[in-house]
């Protein structure tokens, strides 16, 4: 539910509820309730104030988490292509993984920068996109002080005057610094596998192996993807892609501290005019 003019000044209030993973073969059912409020032009014409609250229950393949988080901050639109945000937040969670049941409470200072120079954010054929986020956190209970960082970059290049062939690449890099894996919040660590990381592998199938079929999340993550899209008609395209991912036990990714896996596949894209619909088939290749 969305109200676009709550107080008469363009304020937006969004209430959301989501259920995920129904009938899935990995993990369980996830639930999430969200409340988000934003007020435009609060600190100048290009700077909005925002606040949000999220209540979630996650039942993932290797951990579960019941979490409440609140955040408030500012979002600045520097140009149509560049955005920045700064906030302060609080998170309380109860988690369960290989190390048992734990709870933590942290204060957070989330920072982000986003650059979008694509010709179309839903069906890009040229340009690039990058988003970097850094969230230092202060321990109140159950963990230690630290920070979580994540970078997502994408680039696109097309050939020919009619742009019938498009090359797309993506790189992701993440880390959790400060607490050890045993003391780190389980829902802040990294896994790889499934859509968004390495297609062809089960969701979150790669983490840090603890032996006896037990896996936890990693302190570092690398994701690399490449694909080629070829138009076969005005609306239809075929796609070939290759993904690889790494999860490590150390903040600085090193081969000896973790493992890689890869997947490849083919897909079909149909352009609806408001965005593409896509169907992929992938398999592990390493």
Segments (PLM) and residue ranges:
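C-terminal outer-membrane beta-barrel translocator/porin domains of Gram-negative envelope proteins
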Residues: 2, 92, 96-102, 106-235, ...
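Gram-negative/organellar outer-membrane beta-barrel architecture
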Residues: 2-131, 198-200, 204-215, 219, ...
């Amino acid at each position: 539910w969305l109200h676009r003019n709550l107080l008469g000044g363009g304020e937006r209030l969004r209430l959301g509820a989501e259920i995920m993973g129904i009938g899935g073969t990995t993990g369980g059912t996830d639930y999430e309730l969200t409340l988000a409020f934003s007020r435009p032009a609060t600190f100048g014409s290009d700077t909005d104030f925002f606040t949000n609250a999220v209540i979630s229950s996650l039942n993932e393949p290797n951990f579960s988490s019941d979490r409440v988080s609140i955040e408030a901050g500012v979002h600045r639109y520097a140009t149509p292509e560049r955005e920045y945000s700064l906030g302060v937040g609080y998170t309380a969670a109860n988690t369960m993984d290989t190390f048992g049941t734990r709870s933590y409470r942290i204060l957070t200072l989330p920072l982000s920068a986003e650059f979008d120079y694509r010709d179309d954010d839903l069906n890009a054929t040229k340009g690039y996109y990058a988003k970097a986020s850094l969230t230092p956190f202060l321990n109140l209970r159950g963990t230690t002080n630290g920070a979580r960082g994540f970078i997502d970059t994408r680039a696109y290049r097309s050939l020919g005057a009619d742009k019938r062939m498009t090359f797309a690449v993506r790189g992701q890099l993440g880390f959790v610094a400060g607490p050890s894996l045993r003391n780190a919040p389980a829902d802040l660590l990294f896994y790889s596998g499934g859509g968004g990381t390495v297609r062809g592998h089960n969701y979150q199938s790669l983490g840090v192996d603890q032996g006896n079929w037990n896996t936890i999340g990693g302190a570092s993550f690398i994701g690399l993807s490449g694909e080629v899209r070829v138009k076969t008609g005005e609306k239809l395209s075929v796609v070939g892609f290759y993904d690889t991912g790494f999860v490590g036990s150390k903040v600085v990714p090193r081969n000896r501290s973790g493992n890689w896996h890869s997947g490849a596949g083919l897909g079909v894209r149909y352009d609806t005019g408001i965005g593409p619909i896509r169907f992929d088939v992938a398999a592990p290749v390493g």
